[in-house]
From Swiss-Prot:
Keyword Repeat found: yes
Transit peptide, residues from-to: 1-46
InterPro entries, alphabetized: DYW_dom (IPR032867), E_motif (IPR046848), Pentatricopeptide_rpt (IPR002885), PPR_At4g14850-like_plant (IPR046960), TPR-like_helical_dom_sf (IPR011990)
Additional comment: The DYW motif is dispensable for editing activity in vivo.
Localisation per UniProt entry: Plastid, Chloroplast
Function, in words: Involved in multiple sites RNA editing events in chloroplasts. Involved in the editing of the site 7 of ndhB (ndhB-7) and site 5 of ndhD (ndhD-5) transcripts, which are two plastid-encoded subunits of the chloroplast NAD(P)H dehydrogenase (NDH) complex. Involved in the editing of the site 3 of rpoB (rpoB-3) transcript. Required for the activity of the NDH complex of the photosynthetic electron transport chain. Possesses low endoribonuclease activity in vitro.
Pfam family, one: DYW_deaminase
Record-given protein name: Pentatricopeptide repeat-containing protein At1g11290, chloroplastic
GO-annotated biological processes: mRNA modification; mRNA processing
Gene null: resulting phenotype: Impaired chloroplastic NAD(P)H dehydrogenase (NDH) activity.
UniProt keywords, alphabetically: Chloroplast, mRNA processing, Plastid, Repeat, Transit peptide
Annotated region (Type E motif), positions in chain: 609-684
Length: 809
């Protein structure tokens, strides 16, 4: 591209005017002595749109005014102003004697539409046509270079500008300053600024905006301070430029000072200022003030609406974001791509598929369905609404996939229980030479954590290290979480201890890891260590601590944390916190307290609260509270067969066979099914899956023969099958059914295919049943093996006939 500046073999051919206009060129009807008084001239002066201009153009030709310099200049200028540079060129080309101002206007037009190639071609043509460049020509070109981040071309124009004698011109230097800032070369922009023999408000505003837009917020504020020290009053552009820096630093006190200055200067009524203030207050956490400003605006543009929608989305209030979006539509404001993306983000957070589909349809009507950023937002929305296949279909049709597109799909699969698909897409992405970023690796690590396969965990850890991202706090936090979920809690702690920087999410991941492994005391110790530092715990921290206490029977410590959350840290309680408290009390057998806690909740209990209560009733075989909890669960979530199965198990433990039958009939009537149990074990880098009673595995005969002998051995050691868990068949058949549960098959296969002393790692999609839990303790005893089982709730470390959960799960 840069060679265009020094040599062109041919002058670019710009289309001639339409033939229907050519015959007018020689016609000259009556023209007043002063062309400015001609009706066509008056129409051009009042022209306010491209449509009007196209209607006026034939009048100019018809009246023979085309050769008048006034009309030539006015037509070219207006077509450029309205962004129709091709039509401006069709007016420009046939002119016999072109004034220099026409060349300058055309170049400005190309710059306005940010067409660098055509702007450069036209600039070279000007040299061929002996048009001497003026300083503004260079500023136009520099503007386009900045808009397109073309640093190399921008530097060449800088060189030409110096050769042309404009190196110290204020306008030229301001243009250079702006170009370097937009090309993310802020230090170069600052050098230009410092070399200026004189500076005006525009040059100061340019450097302020440069710092602000390039993430150097403190420097932006410093420049405003220096500007004021030189007795230059900040303009409304200064305020709009510096407010994003205030937002980035969350300096609301400074923001309020700027707001006060804007009011005293009379700028607060300007729509750009009001919009920037709304954005600043929202990003500084003062959403109420932002909304008051927004509601008080006498005039709003689409950017104002977008700022308010984004404010609610970023402050985790998607319901209000959708209300603002709806109000925007009701007031007839046409949404932009930014509006649509904000609304889609809100729908994703709400899991509102219906409204998400409506916005999808709206985006098609607005012609935004080919906008890659909008499509990426649609993919994310469908993934969060559990419509992953719809998202994958959109991704497949997307012609220009960006890194964001790949990341959205990988995360979507990871969050929807399809980790294998996530890894496959990651592999495809790398094969297409798309370079992964931090977000990609965090998503892939999340998928591997879901798989809970140590080999995969070590593989991605190696990839991360080779990518030099093993010191990135987001990636290392994900690694801590992944290793904990893969059963390697010691490796997780090792990575945690080696981290030079930790976020609250890092502490949360490690505390949660200890909790799911049943190491409640270790979780509490780490929580105490966290409180001594500078990072404050958040709601997720307390949820992890309470859950850790629940899994370890540390009831009093859990209660203390629950009340500390509100009293010491002013953290709002969520439904998850209430559910964790019911689980804490219920697991400990304090069912009366748990039920009283539910009844006294200040908000209506949700499914997770009653689900925790029902789970506790199964542990402690309490039919009374189980029926109460189940009744509420069937109302709140009638389509989940899991709660019906749980209630049936409680009835079965109480030998209430008639009730068991009623639950079964109810499930059949509603078409509800029990989720089949599946256990997975990794052997020699390959994952093997087993379902209860299945003979699909190629080594089934060996597995069942080995398992039969193993059952005999553990019976000799004291194992007694819990036949109460099976109904409707004879005792010997009950034992046979119990012996072929998926956990036992996976463990047997692991023992058959590993050497003595090797730890067996098993993953199950459901809660481990009581019989398998008991049997696995005996298996660890008679084989001398450590067996780690991860079920849907926690980890169980079986060793020497005991489990880390202490039979408390």
């Amino acid at each position: 591209m840069s060679s265009q500046l020094v040599q062109f073999s041919t002058v670019p051919q710009i289309p001639n005017p339409p033939s229907r206009h050519r015959h007018f060129l020689s016609e000259r009807n009556y023209i007043p002595a002063n062309v400015y008084e001609h009706p066509a001239a008056l129409l051009l002066e009042r022209c306010s749109s491209l449509k009007e201009l196209r209607q006026i153009l034939p009048l100019v030709f018809k009246n023979g005014l085309y050769q008048e310099h006034f009309f030539q200049t006015k037509l070219v200028s207006l077509f450029c102003r309205y962004g129709s540079v091709d039509e401006a060129a069709r007016v420009f080309e046939p002119i016999d004697s072109k004034l220099n101002v026409l060349y300058h206007t055309m170049l400005k037009g190309f710059a306005k539409v940010s067409d660098l190639d055509k702007a450069l071609q036209f600039f070279v043509r000007m040299r061929y046509d002996d048009v001497e460049p003026v300083v503004y020509n260079f500023t136009y070109l520099l503007k386009v270079c900045g808009d397109e981040a073309e640093l190399r071309v921008g530097k060449e124009i800088h060189g030409l500008l110096v050769k042309s004698g404009f190196s110290l011109d204020l306008f030229a230097m301001t243009g250079l300053e702006n170009m370097y800032a937009k090309c993310r070369q802020v230090n170069e922009a600052r050098k230009v600024f410092d070399r200026m023999p004189e500076r005006d408000l525009v040059s100061w505003n340019t450097i302020v905006a440069g710092y602000s837009q390039n993430g150097m917020a403190r420097m932006a504020l410093e420049m405003v301070k220096s500007m004021c020290e030189e007795n230059l009053k900040p303009s409304f552009i200064t305020i709009v430029s510096v407010l994003p820096a205030v937002s980035a630093l969350r300096l609301i006190s400074v923001g309020k000072e700027i707001h006060g200055y804007a009011m005293r200067s009379g700028f607060d009524s300007l729509v750009n200022i009001s919009t920037a203030l709304v954005d600043m207050y929202a990003k500084c956490g003062s959403l109420e003030t932002a909304r008051q400003l927004f509601d008080g605006m006498l005039e709003r543009n689409v950017v104002s609406w977008n700022s308010m929608i984004d404010a609610y989305v970023q402050n985790e209030n998607p319901k209000e974001a959708m209300l603002i979006f709806q109000k925007m539509l009701d007031e007839g404001v046409k949404p932009t791509d930014v509006s649509v993306m904000g609304a889609l983000h809100a729908c994703a957070d709400l899991g509102d598929l219906e409204r998400g589909r409506f916005i999808h349809k709206l985006s098609v009507e607005l012609g935004l369905d080919r906008n890659v950023s909008v499509v990426n937002s649609l993919i994310s929305m469908y993934c969060k609404c559990k419509e992953v296949d719809t998202a994958a279909s959109m991704f497949g049709k997307l012609q220009s996939r960006t890194l964001v597109s790949w990341n959205a799909m990988i995360l979507g699969f990871a969050q929807n229980g399809r980790p294998i698909d996530a890894l496959n897409y990651f592999s495809q992405m790398r094969s297409r030479t798309v370079k992964p970023d931090t977000f990609t690796y965090v998503s892939v690590i999340t998928a591997i954590a879901e798989l809970s396969i140590t080999h995969h965990a070590k593989w991605i850890h190696g990839v991360v290290m080779r990518s030099c991202l093993d010191k990135n706090v987001f990636v290392t936090t994900a690694l801590v979480d992944m290793y904990a979920k893969c059963g390697a809690i010691m490796i997780a702690r090792l990575i945690f201890d080696m981290m030079s920087e930790r976020h609250v999410t890092t502490w949360n991941a490690m505390i949660d890891g200890y909790g799911t492994h049943g190491f409640g005391k270790a979780a509490l110790e780490l929580f105490e260590e966290m409180q001594k530092g500078t990072i404050k715990p958040n709601g997720v921290t307390f949820l992890s601590v309470i859950s850790a206490c629940s899994h370890s029977g540390l009831v009093e410590a859990g209660l203390k944390c629950f009340y500390m959350m509100k009293e010491n840290y002013s953290i709002e309680l969520s439904m998850d916190h209430y559910g964790a408290m019911v689980d804490l009390l219920g697991r400990a057998g304090r069912l009366n307290e748990a039920w009283d806690f539910i009844m006294q909740m200040p908000v209506k209990p949700a499914v997770n609260v009653y689900g925790a209560m029902l789970g506790a009733c199964q542990i402690h075989k309490n039919v009374n509270f189980a029926e109460k909890a189940a009744e509420r669960l069937f109302e709140l979530n009638p389509d989940d067969g899991g709660y019906h199965v749980l209630l049936a198990n409680i009835y079965r433990a109480a030998s209430m066979w008639e009730k068991v039958g009623q639950v079964r009939v109810s499930m059949l009537r509603q078409g509800l099914r029990k989720t089949p149990g599946c256990s997975m074990v990794e052997i020699k880098n390959e994952v093997h899956s087993f379902f209860s009673g299945s003979t699909a595995h190629p080594d089934s005969k060996k597995i069942y023969a080995f398992l039969e002998k193993l059952i005999c051995h553990i019976k000799e050691a004291g194992y007694v099958p819990d036949t109460n868990l099976v109904l409707g068949v004879e005792n010997d058949v009950k034992e046979q059914l119990l012996s072929t549960h998926s956990e036992k098959l996976a463990i047997s296969f692991g023992l058959l295919n590993t050497t003595a002393g090797t730890t067996i790692h098993v993953r199950k999609n459901l809660r481990v049943c009581a019989d398998c839990h008991n049997a696995t303790k005996y298996i660890s005893l008679v084989t001398g093996r450590e067996i780690v089982v991860r079920d849907m709730q926690r980890f169980h470390h079986f060793k020497n006939g005991a489990c880390s959960c202490g039979d408390y799960w």
